[in-house]
């Protein structure tokens, strides 16, 4: 079946998601905005996901399927983007195979970019485990984040978030190289940073249009692989070193983000029962945190939250006490 031409292409990377995939596909099919196509990328699934994808494409011409050997979520998104660009989609959206769109997700974000004439829009998201939250009405107004405020929001506003899935992008903003960036963690943050840098601003819809499912198999709820620490630190360093020259005021924000990431990653290790596997990473993080304590661009950065400054001091000067605090009060999260 040839892929349909559409205004918006929704890209869904799929890997062993049969338990949740039908709900995800139903939510996409039920979108109030009808001029879309959906590229399902089966990334070497070994459950019923390939069959579910094929059945959906056979029954709804808006859906098309790519089957490929398992190469990871970034490679799957990249394959989907290549297909979307080949068929001439004007706008790109993403959805994870275990999550759900609000019925007005595409229509609301598309309306936002049309009204603001910006190449990028995003909305808030909510989380659910079993019962889906009540669907909120789309917002009456859209907030315009002109540069560099949109980049500052990407780094520091959890409503904007790092994810690719709560956003709508002009196809001119994204390239395959942005998505396949050699990171297994925070790959979406780095891709968003590059896309946001290429955009003059972002339309923000203060409304939970994306439903993020929390379950034991979620990537965000797994353990703490050493690569996660390395990739997150690398992403933050790349961001810090690539602030657009036209927005030099953003450098302070990027520096604060980098230092906060160091402190956060150290706390991720310290809250674990066994920190021995992370001795090397913890040592490197402590060196970076110590070096930045009295640096006006890092530990004394006015944009750095006070709680992070206290955490940085405790990491360096009261490590045993700080570990007890981390173990007792900080939730284990990715």
What are these regions (language model features)?
Residues 34, 42-52, 70, 96:
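A conserved acidic beta->alpha catalytic loop
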Residues 115-118, 271-334:
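Membrane-interface aromatic/basic loop that binds lipid-linked glycans or pyrophosphate carriers
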């Amino acid at each position: 079946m040839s892929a349909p031409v559409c205004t918006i292409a929704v890209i869904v990377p799929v890997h062993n998601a049969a338990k949740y995939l039908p709900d995800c596909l139903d939510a996409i099919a039920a979108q109030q905005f009808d001029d879309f196509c959906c590229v399902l990328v089966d990334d070497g699934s070994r459950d019923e996901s390939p069959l579910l994808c094929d059945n959906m494409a056979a029954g709804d011409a808006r859906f098309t399927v790519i089957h490929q050997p398992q190469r990871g979520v970034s490679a799957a998104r990249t394959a989907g983007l290549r297909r979307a660009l080949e068929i001439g989609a004007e706008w790109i959206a993403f959805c994870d195979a275990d999550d759900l769109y609000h019925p007005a997700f595409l229509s609301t974000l598309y309306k936002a970019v049309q009204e603001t004439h910006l190449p990028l829009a995003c909305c808030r998201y909510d989380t659910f485990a079993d019962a889906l939250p009540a669907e909120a009405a789309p917002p009456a107004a859209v907030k315009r984040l002109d540069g560099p405020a949109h980049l500052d929001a990407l780094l520091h506003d959890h409503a904007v978030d790092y994810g690719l899935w709560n956003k709508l992008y002009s196809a001119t903003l994204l390239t395959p190289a942005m998505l396949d960036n050699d990171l297994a963690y925070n790959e979406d943050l780095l891709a968003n940073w590059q896309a946001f840098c290429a955009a003059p601003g972002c339309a923000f819809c203060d409304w939970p249009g994306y439903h993020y499912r929390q379950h034991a198999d979620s990537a965000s709820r797994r353990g703490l692989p050493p690569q996660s620490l390395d990739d997150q630190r690398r992403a933050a360093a790349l961001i810090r070193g690539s602030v657009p020259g036209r927005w030099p005021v953003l450098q302070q924000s990027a520096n604060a983000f980098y230092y906060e990431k160091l402190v956060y990653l150290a706390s991720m290790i310290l809250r674990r029962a066994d920190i021995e596997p992370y001795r090397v990473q913890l040592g490197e993080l402590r060196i970076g945190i110590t070096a930045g304590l009295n640096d006006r661009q890092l530990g004394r950065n006015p944009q750095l939250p006070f709680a992070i400054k206290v955490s940085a001091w405790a990491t360096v000067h009261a490590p045993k006490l700080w570990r007890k605090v981390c173990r007792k009060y900080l939730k284990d999260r990715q």
